Every structure is written in C-alpha cells, then in structure tokens.
Amino acid sequence: MVTVEEVRKAKRAEGPATILAIGTATPANCVNQSTYPDYYFRITNSEHKTELKEKFQRMCDKSMITKRYMHLTEEILKENPSFCEYMAPSLDARQDIAVVEVPKLGKEAAQSAIKEWGQPKSKITHVFFCTTSGVDMPGADYQLTKLLGLRPSVKRLMMYQQGCFAGGTVLRLAKDLAENNKGARVLIVCSEITVVTFRGPSETHLDSLVGQALFGDGAAAVIVGADPTPAEKPLFQLVSAAQTLAPDSCGAIDGHLREVGLTFHLLKDVPSVVSNNIEKCLFEAFNPLGISDWNSVFWIAHPGGPAILDQVEDKLGLKPEKLRATRHVLSEYGNMSSACVLFILDEMRKASSNAGLGTTGEGLEWGVLFGFGPGLTIETVVLHSVPIKPGPH
C-alpha cells in the first residue's frame, strides 16, 4: 500500500512555476486623457463647478496617462443618469452591467493567452478569476468556464474585491498550485471595468476625483505551469512570492461596496508609505540570491499613479529606464487595478524581443514584480527571465 508521503511526492512538479502565455484585452471605447475633463464634467452635469474642473484638469495633466479604455460610453451613461451623480443609489444597474461584461472581457484576454499557448484548452486544470468590479454567485470564474467551454471538472477559484495588489496575488497562488500539482496548467484572468467606480465629482472628496483621473478598463490572462513541454514556450519563471502589510498604513487605501457602487478612498501619503517600505521587501526577496543592486534587475511595478512611481524611483535610486514598461502601460491604459502588472509583463517581453535583447526581461536575468493596494498590502514576486531565441531571418 502506498503512503501519503509517496502520493504527495508523486504530485509535486520537478521545476519552478513558469508563465507560458500572456493575453490582454480592452473595451473598444477609447478616451483621450487631454479632453477627458471636458467630457467628464459635461456628462456628469457639473460644468458649473469651474474650480473643481480646473483641479481635475491638473490631475489629468499630471497623471502621465495619454489614453484609457472604458466600457462606459456616453450612451450608457445617458441611460443611467444615477452613475453620473456623486452618491446616488445605483448598485443594481452597475451590477447588471458588471456581471456580464467582466467575464466577457476576461474571455477575450483568455482566448488570446490560450492561442499563444498553443495547447488544447482541455489541458487547463485550474482557473483563477480576479476582479474588483462587481460580485455575483456563481461567480465570474463560473461564467468564464462556460464562455470558454472549459471542462466541468476544472478547479476554480474566484477572488473578489482585492484591489490593485492582486495581480501579484494571483501569480503567488498559481505558483503554489503549479508546483504542488504535477501537470497543472493554471489559467489566471484579471478583468476590471470602471462601471462600479465611475461617479460624478465632489468638492469634499478629492480622493474620489483622483480615481476618476486614473482608472481604466482592461483584462489580462496568463497561463502558469511547471515543467514545460517542448511544445510550450516559457516566458518568465516565478521564483518566490511574498505578501506583507505595510506598518502604520491602515486606511491608506480603502474601497467600500455600497448602494452607490464602489467608493474609493485614498490618503495623500500613499506614495511615501509605498516608497518607505519597498526596500525592505526587496531585501527580503533578493538577499537569498545575493542581489542588492536594484538597477541590476528588471522591474514590473503596479502603476498606482505617477507619484508612487516617482517616489519609488527616487528612494531606490533607480535609473529612469527601469520603470519604462510600467510607465508605458500607465500612459497607454491608465490604472487597470489587478490587470496592470500582467499588461506590463506582456509589454516587457514584447519590447525585449523587438529590441533584439537576450532575455524576456530586458536582457537581464532577474526581476521583480510588485503589487500595491488596499491594506496597504504589498505583493513581491521574484521573476527569472527566459532567453529569447533569435527568430529566422
């Protein structure tokens, strides 16, 4: 008779969890950041609030965002005037949209990842779905399973209401699953739409206005598995992962799901809380590897906003090019909450290949992925890049 220990050893993978494919998707509706204040104050019937509009214009100008994608079009907002008020009961209407559109956008990203992966979808053993946009039962994980036609026996995990750190969380959990279940192939989907957070401006709650200037819609999907087959093409290895709460940061970032939708609350000192705690996270992650030069690794940091990136850069003495991929995604898409770091991974491996660099991590061997969000929670994932094989000339 076999022992429990023998069963356990037989289930373990040999090598580290590896990202095998990445896919992304956005809604068709694209909004230009430079003209967004005019549109936002018009659609919310707030044009008489001229000082507040000027303040919002400055927020948008300083955001380092060029454009964003949003499911909420002018037509949808006109059909749902309660969305355009600051605190009007509107959760039912918001939920009606979110429970359909969040899985649908996630499906687009997942199909893109599955196509790149090149394996039959029947080989997907686990599904993680992550969103801060609406809640439902059965969840978006169930809806995605149905939309993609995955096996009924696929093992699902639904993560609601985690916020901006969760792109790191899903990689941490997928790593543990892939390494402890031989042959596992985990489909991760992070899908976020601003239908739950969009609201009119308030002169007394400027943190809500910050969210209106930063947040965008997007979905990203990755496939994670250990011991890649010859037919699979590894992109990054997941070496270690940690989560920590920054000390004395209670209330720094909060979100509350209420009759009025998801309200967003942010303290001014969030950039300094992140920058003051990030080196400790780096040291704990990289000390075992003998790495202490933060410019020697490639960087994927959740772009909560330009102030966070600027302070992290300054505190650690990072060269400007270290956060190029991060700033590029912020500029092109805005803050897409949990999906952002996966978009940045995609941008980095593509840019590395296009530039003819030696690895998926900008030619470097080791890298770090950071998620920052409510708590204040910091997710730290150590990545190892993969050599890029030169394509046929």
UniProtKB/Swiss-Prot annotation:
Matching entries from Pfam families are given as:
Chal_sti_synt_C, Chal_sti_synt_N
What EC number is given for this enzyme? 2.3.1.74
Report keywords, A-Z: Acyltransferase, Flavonoid biosynthesis, Transferase
Q: Which residues form the active site?
A: 164
Q: Which CDD domains match?
A: CHS_like
Enumerate the InterPro entries for this protein: Chalcone/stilbene_synt_C, Chalcone/stilbene_synt_N, Chalcone/stilbene_synthase_AS, Polyketide_synthase_type-III, Thiolase-like
Q: Reaction catalysed?
A: (E)-4-coumaroyl-CoA + 3 malonyl-CoA + 3 H(+) = 2',4,4',6'-tetrahydroxychalcone + 3 CO2 + 4 CoA
GO biological process, alphabetically ordered: flavonoid biosynthetic process; polyketide biosynthetic process
Instruction: Enumerate the PROSITE patterns for this protein.
Output: CHALCONE_SYNTH
Any one GO molecular function term: naringenin-chalcone synthase activity
The metabolic or biological pathway listed in the UniProt record of this protein is: Secondary metabolite biosynthesis; flavonoid biosynthesis
Q: Does the keyword Manganese apply?
A: no
Q: Which family does it belong to?
A: Belongs to the thiolase-like superfamily. Chalcone/stilbene synthases family.
What role does this protein play?
The primary product of this enzyme is 4,2',4',6'-tetrahydroxychalcone (also termed naringenin-chalcone or chalcone) which can under specific conditions spontaneously isomerize into naringenin.
Which protein, by its recorded name, is this?
Chalcone synthase DIII
Name of the gene encoding the protein in the UniProt record: CHS-DIII
